[in-house]
Amino acid sequence: TQLLTKTKAFCACENRYGGMPDTRVCPVCLGLPGAMPRVSKGYVELGAVAGLALNCDIATYTKFDRKHYFYPDLAKGYQITQYDLPLCSDGYVDLPLAHFPKDEQIGGEKHRPTNFKGEDCIIDNKYRRVRIERIHLEEDVGKSLHLEGKHSYIDYNRCGTPLIEIVTKPDMTSPDEAALFMQTVQEILRYVKVTKGNLEEGNMRCDANINLNVWEDGKLYHTPISEIKNLNSFRAIKDACTYEVQRQLKEFEEDRQEFNPGFKVTMGWDEAKGVTVVQRTKNSFVDYRFVVEPDIKPFTVSEELVKSAAEKVGEQKKKKRTRFQEEFGLT
């Protein structure tokens, strides 16, 4: 999710969507030799606002790290992110049960009172809870443009754009729930004014990790994990997840391949054809050579910053909705 700072995460370039390619770049966001990053004003606080809005704990001490990998849209060969000390952790989002199909609501045939760990996930008989493992700060990369012909192009205007990455626990069990989660997060983060939240502009993007639990002959099987990258609409999330579930089930029935904790398939979504396509297979323990970002020292998150972030969150939207319903009899 891209944040609404005036400048990019670690330089003074304007943080704005669009424009002529490669016109809002500088030596810092391109990673040129000798260029030194600095944390832009408001970046950490906006990350804390998002974390508090999503019911997270805010770290008192954190740092930035370098994640090394090669890809054409990553000009400097590494991405500034947070590895082992994320800014936010242990949050949750409550999804209204009324938005689920009737058979998944209280008393329905597919009603799920607990998550995969057996913990209660139904709150006040009104909400289904999805836990958030962590929210970390990182910079965006450039944008690849695949036009007709033999060539692809890179627009580096987007590189260095301030992001938060929201990582959930594996609590969602259907494509509808995944799409509803994304809609709810968009609604919350727009409400606290940390992002525009326009999926069509890339302000929010979704990577969906999917595998199946298959009961057969009294035994539980787990299919290999697939990660569908860069889903940019609620329909794409729902349709891609629906197709991938069907593809995995068919593949399991044909070759009985089971979950391998060290293996993951990266998929893309071909919206025109309505299918997922393999982009690459990889060891999920791939070595990104994480190291502490040497040009940005670790820092303490002050009580004043957290207090200021809490004031910007104000009364959360769910609580305000409940209060309006009780005080004014709204439905």
Feature map (PLM): residue ranges:
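Basic, nucleic-acid-interacting segments
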Residues: 1-315, 320-322, 326-328
